[in-house]
UniProtKB/Swiss-Prot annotation:
PANTHER family: EXPRESSED PROTEIN (PTHR47874), PENTATRICOPEPTIDE REPEAT-CONTAINING PROTEIN PPR5 HOMOLOG, CHLOROPLASTIC (PTHR47874:SF5). PROSITE patterns: PPR (PS51375). This is Pentatricopeptide repeat-containing protein PPR5, chloroplastic. Pfam families: PPR (PF01535), PPR_2 (PF13041), PPR_3 (PF13812). The gene is PPR5. It comes from the Eukaryota. The keyword Chloroplast applies. Disruption phenotype: Albino or pale green seedlings. Seedling lethality. The keyword Endoplasmic reticulum does not apply. InterPro entries: Pentatricopeptide_rpt, PPR5-like, TPR-like_helical_dom_sf. Belongs to the PPR family. P subfamily. GO terms for cellular component: chloroplast. One of its GO terms (molecular function) is mRNA binding. GO terms for biological process: chloroplast RNA processing; Group II intron splicing; mRNA processing; regulation of translation.
Amino acid sequence: MLACPSTSSPWPQRQPPSPCPGGGGGATRHVALAARSKRRGAGPAAAEGVDEAAAEAAELVRSLLRRTAGGKERLVPVLDRHVRVVRTEHCFLLFEELGRRDAWLQCLDVFRWMQKQRWYVADNGIYSKLISVMGRKGQIRMAMWLFSQMRNSGCKPDTSVYNSLIGAHLHSRDKTKALAKALGYFEKMKCIERCQPTIVTYNILLRAFAQAGDTKQVDMLFKDLDESVVSPDVYTYNGVLDAYGKNGMIKEMESVLVRMKSTQCRPDVITFNILIDSYGRKQTFDKMEQVFKSLLRSKERPTHPTFNSMITNYGRARLREKAESVVEKMEELGFKPNYVTQECLIIMYAHCDCVSKARQVFDELVTSQTKVHLSSLNSMLEAYCMNGLHTEADRLLDTALQQCVVPNGSTYKLLYKAYTKANDKLLVQKLLKRMNKQGIVPNKKFFLDALEAFGTSDRKPRTSPGINSASKPSTDSAGDSETATSDKPEVSVWHVAAT
């Protein structure tokens, strides 16, 4: 049925990087550029100068991080070597980048290094940024320690610090306790003149309570917001719509949409995308298609996530022709499918038992890329596993390793779940040996997630979709959405919530 991956498959050839002439001069050049940016004067091109300075600061930070040899060397000695040009703005960028890399301990090292510099002045912005980074990494105690350190340094907390603190608590595992803490800080903010809640505060809390499904508290926060001097914005509504939509709370989502209309807040493309994805997840395809038509008539323009969401949700319902019509519509509107779109197509074909078609898309994707995204490999491996083709998945992984595509924990987790569920001990042992060779040590969560495979099915029952998801595209399908409007009255996004 399937052609096994071979050495002649269209994987991009890896070329060794050419040596950089004068390799040691890169950092010096960036340092000089950053220093020169300090001397730029104001004038008609001041805005352009600011942009250039920001770009040069970002380049200096990248240069500093490169000199840590991928995190093997400590960052502080590198900072010491460039102490003459590194300033607060560079440290801010370092905090952000180190946070993305899960290197929160290095963030603290940079912070301690900052405190020793003559130019350092204790500032709320620094503490706010660090508290935010620690919170995102689940280091709540460290965030609280920084909050107390800030007070000891003579800084008085302001709204931004409390917003970061609320956000940090909401990243903790105990959501009930976290929400109670967040509300406590919120009430405290109201009592301090310099810490009055802003729309950012309300947005954080509204989204958090909507994610928890606490509609009563969401309504209370909206009422509080109506009575305050702060006005809701499109981010306010998008956060709540998205949270309700992902929870499958469609009625609650639609009530927020009605509220949005009553405040005359205009939906943006993210609003449309949230609605399309939410209705698609529930397989309410008639409403999903109505929202798509409304988007085409609006001043907004669809984005790749718009189409990717529709392809994914049609795929889950095994509506292959409708999903393919979305690709046609996409190209008709001048969009070129990106690698994420092709990954969505791979999974869609896997749901529809068209694994050979999925492999064809994957091969085209590999041929068109200079670098194979790991998510693309994972999509094809998942497609094989969904259809019980574990040997083909193992061969594809062999080919990927030969082509220097390095799998990560997510790759091994999806394969381990599939092999374990199929009770294929040989493939499980082979996989664990590969992980050991690569230095990936599975943790408790890895095995717990894999054990869930025994209690749930990777594939949905092959039942016929309901009345809202006919097996063939109708005149109202996404592919015809722009032209098939003459027989029915035009429907806006507001009317969708009312139907």
